[in-house]
């Protein structure tokens, strides 16, 4: 047995507990004989004033949705109806194709695809996407024209930094639009200039404004077709005009086409790549929306550039180099991709479009019967519609965020405020849900409006 003395042994034991009257206590800033240590100036603390810390949440649908969801009364008697999301996979009726599930399961069970893949994607998967996309354009894409990404979101994350390499560059974004473009541009110090989509013209691009807002530093413009958040589908003639203006301005077109298979009306989906011979196109696509599997995280950037402008200017090289230092989709999902594209039956898409079409009809009808909100254009594609709030008819509703928060609190219905999409005092409604739930949700919106109408408002709706 070891005995400790009352001298050095006690001091050592006390120091071990940070209780010494000497230097050990100074560690706690409590020494009787020494001043407390000076505060450290942490160099990384300057980041508190950065874009991510100060304004990042303003450009996030997810963040604003969480904020609104916090207004819901958890003990309420009715289920929460999520009409703000773009993920109908939560509803069993929107389950993906069995062929897609089988392809992923088979790839996983081989045990051969638990490894890393090349940064740009597996060759067979790239070739399959190229073959799939070539069906809609007058020339053939190769595997080298396709870069696989972790969903459409990473495709945006890849393209924006590539365009931001030039000092002082700017990009043209639609208003309303998808806020991830705005956020990524801000993070990469790429200036944003907006062009409007015109509600009364089916949310067409205000083409006449493009030349006035662009300059020699403009590198690209973004179009979303079929459109999120408006539900529009652009015609061949309209897209041709966009391509001609892009050529005149010397810019490339970023075509967000993740909803390309979700067309509800008679107007067909025209890939922007059809006009790649006029102006180069980077098309963003994914399995997420058309196959209803956003959690699988598989998307792509496809290069439509038959004149090889993007190759000569090293845009394609820059994309490759970015992906080589970034993440990539799960390798087994990449391996499954050729079979998913080849084996998914037309009946699956027919079923999904049938559900969306039925729900879009309900959505449009219910909105038309509610005088407190206005829908300027019936949705033709995607899974969304933009709706104007007639706030002058409502009492104590200050703006779109106030409307959405109070609606969530009183009716347990979640909508997406238009301000996060670039249009204040509008809301985005998703109709990608079970028709009965959508009907219930829109009836709750109507009840909320009637309950909060101005006292001098005419009764009824």
From Swiss-Prot:
It is an enzyme of class 2 (transferase). The keyword Ubl conjugation does not apply. The keyword Transferase applies. Induction: By iron deficiency. No expression is detected when sufficient iron is present. Its EC number is 2.6.1.80. The modification N6-(pyridoxal phosphate)lysine is found at residue 289. Its cofactor is pyridoxal 5'-phosphate. Expressed in roots, but not in leaves. It catalyses: nicotianamine + 2-oxoglutarate = 3''-deamino-3''-oxonicotianamine + L-glutamate. Keywords: Aminotransferase, Pyridoxal phosphate, Transferase. This is Nicotianamine aminotransferase A.
């Amino acid at each position: 047995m070891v005995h400790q003395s009352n001298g050095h042994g006690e001091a050592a034991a006390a120091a071990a507990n940070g209780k010494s009257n000497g230097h050990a206590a100074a560690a706690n800033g409590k020494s009787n004989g020494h001043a407390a240590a000076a505060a450290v100036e942490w160099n990384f603390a300057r980041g508190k004033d950065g874009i991510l810390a100060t304004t990042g949440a303003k450009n996030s649908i997810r963040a604003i949705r969480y904020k609104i969801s916090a207004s819901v009364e958890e003990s309420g008697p009715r289920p929460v109806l999520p009409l703000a999301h773009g993920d109908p996979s939560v509803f069993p009726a929107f389950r993906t194709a069995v062929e897609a599930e089988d392809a992923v399961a088979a790839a996983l069970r081989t045990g051969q695809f638990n490894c890393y893949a090349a940064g740009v994607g597996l060759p067979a998967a790239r070739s399959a996407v190229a073959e799939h996309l070539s069906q809609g354009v007058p020339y053939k894409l190769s595997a080298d024209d396709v870069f696989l990404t972790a969903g459409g979101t990473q495709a945006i994350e890849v393209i924006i930094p590539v365009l931001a390499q030039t000092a002082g560059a700017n990009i043209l974004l639609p208003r309303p639009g998808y806020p991830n473009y705005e956020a990524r541009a801000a993070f990469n110090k790429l200036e944003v200039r907006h062009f409007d989509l015109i509600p009364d013209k089916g949310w067409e691009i205000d083409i006449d404004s493009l030349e006035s807002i662009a300059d020699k530093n403009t590198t690209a413009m973004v179009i979303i077709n079929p459109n999120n958040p408006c539900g529009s589908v652009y015609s061949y003639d309209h897209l041709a005009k966009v391509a001609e203006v892009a050529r005149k301005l010397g810019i490339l077109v970023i075509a967000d086409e993740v909803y390309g298979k979700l067309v509800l009306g008679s107007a067909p989906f025209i890939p922007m790549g059809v006009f790649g011979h006029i102006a180069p196109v980077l098309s963003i696509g994914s399995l997420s929306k058309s196959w209803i599997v956003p959690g699988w995280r598989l998307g792509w950037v496809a290069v439509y550039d038959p004149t090889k402008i993007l190759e000569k200017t090293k845009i394609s090289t820059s994309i490759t180099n970015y992906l080589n230092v970034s993440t990539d989709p799960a390798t087994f999902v990449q391996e499954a991709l050729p079979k998913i594209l080849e084996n998914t039956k037309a009946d699956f898409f027919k079923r999904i479009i049938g559900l969306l079409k039925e729900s879009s009809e309900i959505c449009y009808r219910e909105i038309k019967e509610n005088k407190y909100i206005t829908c300027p254009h019936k949705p033709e594609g995607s899974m969304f519609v933009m709706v104007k709030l007639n706030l002058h008819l409502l009492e104590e509703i200050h703006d779109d965020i106030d409307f959405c928060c109070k609606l969530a609190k009183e009716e347990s219905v979640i909508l997406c405020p238009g301000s996060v999409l670039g249009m204040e005092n509008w809301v985005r409604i998703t109709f990608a849900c079970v028709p009965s739930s959508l009907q219930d949700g829109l009836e709750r919106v109507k009840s909320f409006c009637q309950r909060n109408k101005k006292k001098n408002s005419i009764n009824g709706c």
